[in-house]
Amino acid sequence: MRLLFGDAAASARRPEEYEARYPRRALPKGAMVTRYAPSPTGFMHIGGIFVSLINKRLSLQSEGVFYLRLEDTDVKRAIPGALDTIVDSLARFDLSPQEGVLRAPAKDGDASSRGEFVQQGSYGPYIQTERVEIYRDYAIDLIRRGFAYPCFCTVEELDAIRQEQMALTVKPGVHGRWAKWRDAPLARVKEALAGGTPFVLRLRAPDDVSGRVEWKDGVKGVISMPVNDLDTILLKSDGIPTYHFAHAIDDHLMRTTHVIRGDEWISSMPLHLQLFRTLGFRPVEYAHVPPIQKLDRVEEVDPETGETKVSDARRKLSKRKDPEANIAYYREIGVPETGTIEYLLNIANSAFEDWRKANPDKPYSAFPLKLNKLAPGGALSDMVKLKSVSQAVVSRMSAEDVYAQGLDWAREHDKELAALMERDPEYTKRALGIERGGKKSNKRITTWPDLRPQLFFFYDELYDRVDALDFPENVPEGDRQPLLRQMLDTFDPADSKEAWFEKIRQIAVASGYAGEVKQYKASPESWKGHVGDVSMLLRVAVCGTRNSPDLTEVMAVLGEPRVRARIARFL
């Protein structure tokens, strides 16, 4: 052993020492310990938020623990700043873990600064490159027990093996007669070491690989696959473990109960279960979630008829081709974080939609998410559904929440609007509070970019920029000034909505407009237009647009001086 690991072999801890160092967690019966274990290799994928959401909800519902572990053993693929993206994205979506890699509070309470990374919890380190000694000690134990061996195959030799296997159409990899160092005599190993030949440590797969391995997946049910027959690499030549080896040790020692991850890992399950048993661990419960997918329009030309056939093909969201794969995209287009979360809950479990309708005032966290109710098939990315959910989420928000979250978005994406919103926060909140609350709450805001068209007329700087006003067609130019003059003369901010509309109706009738829309429709040739046209004339004059909330409430927020000044512009 000393030949392979030097002095480290003598000081290696035994598995029982690690069992004592990382005892079973003192949690209630049925508590789930789950984790999100990303690699720092790029932007935060929507699938990462999806899986984190499921993991955190299930752990909290069961009084368990959700933790973050950084799987950074693939140093070549690591991207600077990726850890910032992971930790900050989880925080933004209220998915921060209870333990693992976290960001410390900002110094001196400065919310604009970001704290340093810390590792919180008793089962760390939570960064794999800081656990190399643990993996090495378990590797030494496997060698002692005859379940691992050093392999000195060069890159050229491995390539030759691959070429031969391709020619024979057999499974590629180190197995069977191609496992050239599996039973190498000690003298040969010493010779390779003396020559300075680098080596990797490989798992010794079972001699009998004719059977199958079967397990019950938490999402997909019972799955059966051939037993793993590859002598998989456990430690690379630099002593860094592979994902397969590290995850088995980490999930056992961190006392993970459920590994919930993307279903691209199903093909590795025979190896992972084999590793757990070889290491002497009880396997965790596995649940594989299908990826969010997208439809691609595919055109194929029939070689016989020459006709073009069009079909839809499913594929998972691509990091390279699909902007919606990046969680930052949802922020950019202005979907509130809760909107994205509720959209993902719809994908996870279709029952959420009916639950939300029955419980409009409850937080999404009250929804009883169940592992065995997760959709086993891949859901399609649906931007129309996303915006529908977003609109519903915003409609349930208080004016204070709309202000806070909308301002947070505007500071990054619409700085002019943000400055106007911040100039008088209470004024802006009153504007946002119009038609908010109740069963017919304002649904004019779907995403945060909608704030500008819904708020611009409350700010003179933006209202004054409107060039072409869309006055109603049924009110000829010659009628505009007289009608607006009468409305200005009779305007009283103390009027109720009903009293003010009655004044407009009387002005309309006296000027040749029908007092009711149905009256106009019954005999359009008898009238210039109807009271709605006259009311719209006032709306356009005051707001600069036909699209605004209740005009009486808008004018109350604008205030009498501003309303009178705007009407007077057209006299």
UniProtKB/Swiss-Prot annotation:
It comes from the Bacteria. It is found in: Cytoplasm. It catalyses: tRNA(Glu) + L-glutamate + ATP = L-glutamyl-tRNA(Glu) + AMP + diphosphate. SUPFAM superfamilies: An anticodon-binding domain of class I aminoacyl-tRNA synthetases, Nucleotidylyl transferase. Its main location: cytoplasm. Its EC number is 6.1.1.17. A motif ('KMSKS' region) lies at residues 316-320. One of its GO terms (molecular function) is ATP binding. GO terms for cellular component: cytosol. GO terms for biological process: glutamyl-tRNA aminoacylation. Keywords: Aminoacyl-tRNA synthetase, ATP-binding, Cytoplasm, Ligase, Nucleotide-binding, Protein biosynthesis. Pfam families: Anticodon_2, tRNA-synt_1c. It is an enzyme of class 6 (ligase). Disulfide bonds: none annotated. A motif ('HIGH' region) lies at residues 38-48. ATP binds at residue 319. Monomer. Belongs to the class-I aminoacyl-tRNA synthetase family. Glutamate--tRNA ligase type 1 subfamily. Catalyzes the attachment of glutamate to tRNA(Glu) in a two-step reaction: glutamate is first activated by ATP to form Glu-AMP and then transferred to the acceptor end of tRNA(Glu). This is Glutamate--tRNA ligase.
